[in-house]
Amino acid sequence: MDLSPRVRAVCDLDVSEVREYAGRHEYDGKPQDLSPAGVRAGLARLAAARADGDQLADTHDEAHLSAAEVQKRVAYAELELHRRNPILHLGELDLACYDRDYAPREERDAARAEHIAAWPRVADAAVGSLDQVSAPAYQRSCGPVVSSR
């Protein structure tokens, strides 16, 4: 089932969760680009889809979709969580979804290999994005902060 542009734009800003928990296997092997440029592009697609898209006929569904759009804007544009929360980047490295028997082994293995091949890009995006991690979080994971003063 194809997704409407608005739903697709929301899903594109939550790739690891959508792949793992919604079973959207078109995202297999394709980690989300959480670099600053990648997030800006995703937010631009979200805004364009919202501006160009029709409201859903069902008011309940429309309310859920609108709330999801707001959540993505708050998470990525206002709070910039991709710049301060390493877990978002770690989620893009997760390969566990390929362990389930949702498709033939060969298809899952190919998706896993494609996903692993993208790891350098995911790591580069994390390095380029994570410039607002709090010092206590950094110290717990990496050791003491060295000051140049």
Predicted regions and their residues:
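N-terminal maturation segment of proteins
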Residues: M1-R149
